């Protein structure tokens, strides 16, 4: 015994285990026979685990009662909406595609679980968590591709698909059970009710078959429209456009293929016969000033612009056949909008905040207001202890009546080593040069020079005496040698 479920994700064929769960299979078969499941939404999708369906309205509808069994549906008795579910000990949720009835504990007896119309189909292996909670009555034998699509569906935080996945039709391939009293099989599939239509998020037909039977040109046009909308939204977010749906002005013409010698006055004279021209500008290179061979002409009204468009297309100007079209540029509109926005910001700039908005305060200081005064409070290099006693730092100011301060260890005009922490080469100290010494030090230098001159004279006199003695001794020796001869 089998049932075919036609869903928006594909066809699914289910084999029923009538020998192990006869009452569950009878309930499912008869509900399919009366088209109870038609347009029922797929919900509670858990990837690689399971999904649930069988409620004609679904959990998103406030009017949903959770579904009913075939006996409660035929009689209308609320007590027959559910029936006790049977759990066969040999049937386990071990395989992908296991079909089981969703159950809930009976309010009067929590140990008894009852079923209605909703059923579960597993999307993964070893889903034994459902054992004892869902009553197995069948298994999927065909249509695993549809299970893959449902498994990959985009869902919200509650597991409801953003694009509707619904049961469109049910076909019974084999039914061994007799019809209960009052059952009438509809001749055709009934259309969805108003309550069911209210639960539609995104219609599956529009989403899944939007591009069916559409030629390539139409698909390309749709693709370009989507790209244009995305780019316009991006430009709006970046601030280049006032809004994404901005349209170019209808009173501006775009003229191209111009001769480089054609100027603004020439075009204004030629196009001026169709109406009053507000502006005529040939676009030029910013650096060289050469014409880029296209221009924009703005008319006072739309009618003049249309007349020029129909009359001037392909006209010969300065030996060039020009091309005329309606302008698609929104740069002027963007410039006007941007200038207006900036002027508002400048007007509101004095009101506080950033751009005139009080909540947007641009922070300009990185220290407390009390620390903004430069001077002794700056401690980027020295610690608090090192800053104590530094000349010109934290030392208290002396009054004029106290007299001059006592000289410090380096109060002679030389820079302090601790104050100068630069790693650059030290400049030459001209005060140590010979010719740039202070006047008070010249006397000491003169005395040193006189002392050196005296020592030099004394050494010179000693050398003269030594030479004379050697000469006398040499002369006596020579006389002795002569006398001996």
UniProtKB/Swiss-Prot annotation:
Region (Disordered) location: 377-485
EC number: 5.2.1.8
Family in the record: Belongs to the cyclophilin-type PPIase family. PPIL4 subfamily.
One Gene Ontology MF term: peptidyl-prolyl cis-trans isomerase activity
Comp. bias regions, Basic and acidic residues: 426-485
The keyword NADP appears for this protein: no
Presence of the UniProt keyword RNA-binding in the record: yes
Residue stretches making up the PPIase cyclophilin-type domain: 1-172
Localization, UniProt: Nucleus
A Gene Ontology cellular-component term: nucleus
SS bonds (residue pairs): none
Function: PPIases accelerate the folding of proteins. It catalyzes the cis-trans isomerization of proline imidic peptide bonds in oligopeptides.
One Pfam entry name: RRM_1
UniProt keyword list: Isomerase, Nucleus, RNA-binding, Rotamase
Catalytic activity: [protein]-peptidylproline (omega=180) = [protein]-peptidylproline (omega=0)
Domain of life of the native organism: Eukaryota
Protein name, entry field: Peptidyl-prolyl cis-trans isomerase-like 4
InterPro entries: CRIP, Cyclophilin-like_dom_sf, Cyclophilin-type_PPIase_dom, Cyclophilin_PPIL4, Nucleotide-bd_a/b_plait_sf, RBD_domain_sf, RRM_dom
RRM domain span: 251-329
């Amino acid at each position: 015994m089998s049932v075919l479920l036609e869903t928006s994700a594909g066809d699914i064929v289910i084999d029923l285990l009538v020998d192990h769960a006869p009452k569950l299979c009878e309930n499912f078969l008869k509900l399919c026979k009366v088209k109870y499941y038609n347009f029922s939404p797929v919900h509670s999708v858990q990837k690689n685990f399971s999904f649930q369906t069988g409620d004609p309205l679904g959990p998103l509808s406030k009017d949903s009662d959770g579904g009913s069994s075939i006996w409660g549906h035929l009689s209308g008795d609320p007590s027959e909406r559910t029936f006790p579910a049977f759990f066969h000990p040999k049937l386990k949720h071990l395989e992908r595609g296991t079909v089981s009835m969703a159950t809930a504990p009976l309010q009067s007896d929590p140990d008894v679980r009852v079923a209605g119309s909703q059923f579960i189909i597993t999307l993964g292996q070893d889903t034994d968590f459902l054992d004892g909670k869902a009553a197995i009555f069948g298994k999927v034998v065909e249509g695993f591709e549809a299970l893959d699509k449902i498994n990959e569906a985009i869902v919200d935080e509650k597991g409801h698909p953003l694009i509707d996945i619904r049961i469109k039709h049910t076909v019974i391939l084999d039914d061994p059970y007799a019809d209960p009293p009052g059952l009438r099989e509809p001749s055709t599939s009934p259309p969805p009710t108003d309550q069911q239509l209210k639960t539609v998020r995104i219609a599956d037909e529009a989403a899944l078959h939007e591009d069916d039977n559409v030629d390539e040109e139409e698909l390309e046009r749709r693709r370009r429209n989507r790209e244009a909308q995305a780019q316009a939204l991006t430009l709006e977010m970046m601030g280049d456009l006032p809004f994404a749906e901005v349209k170019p002005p209808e009173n501006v013409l775009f003229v191209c293929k111009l001769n480089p010698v054609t100027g603004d006055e020439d075009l204004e004279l030629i196009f001026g016969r169709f109406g009053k021209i507000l502006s005529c500008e040939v676009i030029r290179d910013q650096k060289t000033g050469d014409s880029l061979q296209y221009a924009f002409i703005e008319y006072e009204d739309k009618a003049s612009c249309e007349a020029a468009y129909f009359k001037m297309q392909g006209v010969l100007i300065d030996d060039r056949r020009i091309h005329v079209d309606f302008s698609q540029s929104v740069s002027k509109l963007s410039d006007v909008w941007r200038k207006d926005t900036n002027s508002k910001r400048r007007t509101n700039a004095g009101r506080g905040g950033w751009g005139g908005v009080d909540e947007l305060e641009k922070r300009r200081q990185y220290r407390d207001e009390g620390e903004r005064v430069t001077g002794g409070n700056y401690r980027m290099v020295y610690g608090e202890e090192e800053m104590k006693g530094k000349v010109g730092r934290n030392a208290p100011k002396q009054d004029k009546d106290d007299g001059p301060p006592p000289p410090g260890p380096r109060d002679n005009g030389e820079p302090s080593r601790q104050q100068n922490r630069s790693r650059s080469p030290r400049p030459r100290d001209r005060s140590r040069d010979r010719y740039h010494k202070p006047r008070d030090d010249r006397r000491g230098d003169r005395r040193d020079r006189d002392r050196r001159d005296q020592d030099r004279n004394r050494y010179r006199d000693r050398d003269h005496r030594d030479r004379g003695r050697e000469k006398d001794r040499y002369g006596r020796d020579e006389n002795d040698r002569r006398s001996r001869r």
